[in-house]
Amino acid sequence: MIYENSFLLETSDLIADDDAILLSNNRNEFFSFSANTGALNWQQKINSNIRPTLIENLIFTVTIEGFLVVIDNKTGNIIRITNVFDKIKKNKRSKIKPVGFIVGTKNIYLTTDNGLLILIDISSGRSSSILKVDNEKISRPFILNKNLFIIKDNSIIKLN
């Protein structure tokens, strides 16, 4: 009998600062490696395959299940975990996957694979509003000249 365990590994983009290289994957692993030696600084059990964001000493990431996780970059300690899918009906949550996010001064802007743009209050970590942009996957948001842009299919959506 031959047993095969096929598993598609999806990793986040790498991000780095002067001391560490950070990445996560969909196998419940989030890593910090030394930028100088390549040695493991710390590891956490966080299930995310989207690009994390590093601001000063804080790492922001969103799990595949829809939890915003804030981590201390030096120690790897989890500072806060909040459910950002809390305003979405429970029976629909498992069908929604985060695509990407950006961190603004007051909000985190999270896009999903079913066309939602979720605004998350940065101080509380809770979703403050949800906008339906499309019925299908939309891109990770980006900001240019104080405007938010999202790509969907063959078009670019500009939000003020």
Describe each region flagged by the PLM:
Residues 1-18, 39-56, 80-102, 128-145:
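Extracytoplasmic beta-rich repeat domains
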Residues 23-25, 31-34:
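Structural recognition of beta-strand segments within beta-rich domains
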Residues 27, 65, 114, 153-154:
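Surface-exposed loop/turn positions within WD40 beta-propeller blades
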Residues 31-32, 69, 118, 157-158:
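WD40 beta-propeller blade core
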Residues 34-37, 73-76, 121-125, 160:
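Short loop/turn segments that connect beta-strands within beta-propeller blades
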Residues 54-55, 61-71, 77, 81-120:
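Loop/turn-rich, solvent-exposed surfaces of beta-rich toroidal or solenoidal domains
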